[in-house]
Amino acid sequence: MALPRNLQDTFSLQEVQFLVENEPIKIMPRITTKPIRRKAASTPSAGSSVRWKLITTDDHNVNNMVAMSSTEVSLWLALLLKQQGKCSIVAPAWLTIKQLDSFIEFELQNTSRFANLPWNWLIIAHLLFQKAADDFRDPVHILRAKIQDLREARLGKIAKGLQHLNESHLQLDNLSLSEINEMRPFAVGVMDKLRDIHAAAADREQYANNI
């Protein structure tokens, strides 16, 4: 079964989110999963015991957690543990009012360059605002507004960058996957049309030279 036309040239939102949720993020566990060594004399069943055992494909950090000692896990697992009350999520260093203000200032002062944000910044911000709002030190409503301001500033520059689009080249460095995904159908469509126009012009020129 063929994909719908709108999904043939882009990722769906769910696909983008799936990719992002496999990225690592720092958490503060509220549980201990690290094996506890007990002395032989202390209990009849000597050896190691585990308070919690979580099953996942990459279980080293997950099954060696110590309560209130930071560690890194995949974002999807961090969100699951957060939902179950087993951890708090440490917000990324770039997701603060001060840092977002710095990014916004850069975007406004540099008309032809984009701030060097993480490739997944929009999705990360959306997921953490939605599912871990109480883990931020800064007010979430202000952070949301800053993210929106940053997004709008970058969208304006993307629109200007598309004015320089040709049939073979478009360079817009430091765009996130979501931003590229949004502009890709339009950009690819325009480049295909320009390529057809150039090919037709070349054919006409060759025909004229052969007359």
From Swiss-Prot:
Q: Name one GO cellular component term.
A: CMG complex
Sorted alphabetically, which Pfam families does this protein's record hold?
Answer: PSF2_N (PF25005), Sld5 (PF05916)
Family indicated by similarity = Belongs to the GINS2/PSF2 family.
Q: Where does the protein end up?
A: Nucleus
The protein in question is named: DNA replication complex GINS protein PSF2
Q: Which domain of life is it from?
A: Eukaryota
Any one GO biological process: chromosome segregation
Biological role stated in the UniProt entry: The GINS complex plays an essential role in the initiation of DNA replication. Has a role in chromosome segregation.
Enumerate the InterPro entries for this protein. Answer: GINS_A, GINS_bundle-like_dom_sf, GINS_Psf2, PSF2_N
Entry keyword Nucleus = yes
Look up and give the organism this protein is from: Eremothecium gossypii (strain ATCC 10895 / CBS 109.51 / FGSC 9923 / NRRL Y-1056)
Which cysteines form disulfides?
none
Primary subcellular site in the record, as a coarse category: nucleus
